[in-house]
């Protein structure tokens, strides 16, 4: 059992320590009442039997029987009521812990760098935020409801057994260390199996998410059989870990019960001998045997809780790994980036996605305010990396990136990104109305401003033709608008932000030629007098750029206007001719 993870998980109880204290007190009173009952019942049995014998087996003290029954009923009701209260309050505490964990995960996602999401499986992240949280919720709710009463009942029964008859109590106690020893051995195997189960579940969820996202590609390349084989391999691995986890955790209770039953029989035999010799009353034997039966309940609960706790800790460890992941650099007292004109300079910039491999070295780019700069080059040349560095999705290794002479590293990243509008090749729409999706870039925008942005992006016409217009509900997977129309909405979203700098990363790659011409016309108007970076593979779309940067292996190897680069008959000219041959 991972004690560090357990200690950290228990630290989430601190805000509710008053309630936990109340639960502990309530549980203590409930257990005190509960463990008294077998002894009271045993004493009552002795009293009734002695009076019956004293009457020469002629009469039963019914009045005494009813009095005892009434007392027992009151005690049972009180114990049950207190037990209910304890479970109610502890369920609230468990829900509070899950709420705080979910809140921390949500806040953590906002502080994680883009690098983290690029390096992690999306399905595994979703599994940590959903499946692992649910595992903790299910396990903690059950464990927290049982933990106090189980521990207190266990020790309470042992104490009461010693008050009834010490020799029989010692005999009854002998099976407990053996049970705990065996449970401990099984628990180690169970813990490993639960940890493997959670890790494999994350990988399986990642595979399912990947398959679902790319199901068209899977079908297009007839990959179904191989995909099923890969899924089956992961599923078999999960099955192997899952059955082991359940098997080992399930062994604990029957083994504990078996040992308890053996000891129970032994206590009954010895108790009978003691009664025959007058060392214990009939009621005393009854009480001891009842306690032996009752102690199997907390022992069984303890075995069950060990399995649940191991499952919970395996899930908690994965969640804490996420919460402990390296965050974006603290911005401290950094200032807001002031209003900008749009001069952008890369000065001797070096960068690598990993420390071992340098992608860019001594990169220098000079863009004047209001210029439209196109970045072209083969796949892997570093085009998108330039944008990632400008947006500070990744931080440079050395050098400086300046806007209007301000080093962007010296200012709050939010203030930088608020001045830049991005339209990416991969469209992304959120669950909500079209109006809400466009307004995402500026939540305080009026309806009129939303419509104006849509008109500038040539999206207004198709939006108004939809049944609910701007109130049409869409999701990323929606099929009531085309891929090109989705791209138009993302462009409208960027326009609404009214940024000082525009970034268009293959913004027209998902639209038809007619729509591309509309977008290009809108872009020419919108980008007028604004610094714009355009990444494009279709070189025909960037002829009017003020400057074209040709990149290869992370460096700018050519730059100039479209006509100047064609006249050089260099790398760009070769790319351009290749597209039309």
Report the location of each language-model feature.
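Transmembrane helix-loop-helix hairpins at lipid-water interfaces of multipass membrane proteins
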Residues: 2, 20-82, 162-167, 278-282
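Alpha-helical segments in transporter systems
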Residues: 10, 18-43, 72, 87-91, ...
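ABC-type nucleotide-binding domain
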Residues: 331-332, 337-581
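A short amphipathic helical element positioned immediately N-terminal to and/or at the very start
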Residues: 2-15, 125
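An intracellular "coupling" helix at the cytosolic face of ABC transporter transmembrane type-1 domains
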Residues: 114-115, 131-140, 144, 148, ...
